[in-house]
Amino acid sequence: MPRSKSYNTYSSLQRPEFRKRVDELLLKFERDFYEKSKGAEGMLDANKFDLDLYKRHNVETMIRIGLKRAVDPLVANYWATRDPQLSKEWGLYGAEEGRHDRMFAGDLHKVGMTDEEIYAIRPTFATELLNGYFYYTLATEGPLASMISGFYLEYIAGKTQPDWLDIMEQHVGANNTKGARAHLALDEDDDHVDMVWNMIMRVIKTEEDEERFVEHLTKINSLFVSYFVEVYAATVLGLGSDPSQLTQVSPGAAVQTNLQARVAAV
C-alpha cells in the first residue's frame, strides 16, 4: 500500500533499454566514488566512523531538501501548460519530498544538535553550485536537470544509505537513525525510483534527449561527489575553519569526477 500521495502509478517501466544503460552508468558512478573519493571507503568501515561527518552529512541533506523545496514548484509550473498530468505528478512528489528534512532533524536532535545549530550552517559550495545549475538550466532549457537530480538521489540513496546506516547505527544506535530509515522505507514503499524515472521519460523522446539526460546525470553526480569531498575535508580533515581551502575543494573534485566519467564513456 502507498504511504503517501506520491507513489508510482505507472503500469510498466518506461524506456527500459535506456534505463538499463543509465543503471550501468550509475553503478559505475557508485563504484568510482568508493574507489577514488578520499574518505568514501570509510562510510563502509565501522572503525572509521566520524560523528562530525555524520552530523554534517545529515545537515547538508536537510539543506538540500529545503533548497529543492523552492525549485520543485517551478518544475510543476513549467509543465502546467505543457503536460498537465506531469505537472500534477511532480507537484505531489515535490510536496512530499519537501517535508522530509524534518525526518533528518529528528535524528540530529538525538545526537545533541538543536534546530538553531542546524539552520545556522550554510550549504557547501558544491550544494550552491548544484542549485545554481538547476536555476540556470531551468532558465535556458527547462527543468530536466532538476528532475534528473530527483531520480539520481532516489537511486543512489537506495543503493548506498542502507549500508551507511548499518555502520552509523553501530555508533549512534538504531533509535537515533529512525528518521533516515523512515525516509528510505517511504521511498521504497512508494517506488519512488521508478516513479521519478517514469515521470521524466514522459519528456524524453529522442536519442538527443537521452544524451542530454546522460550529460545532466554526469554533471549532477560530479557535484554530489564534490559535496562529499567538501564535507569530509571540513570535518575529518579539519579544514572547516578555512573557507578559502574548502571553496577550492568542491570545483576541483567536480571537474576531476566529470572528466573521469567522460573518458570512461568514450
Predicted regions and their residues:
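Non-heme di-metal
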Residues: 2-266
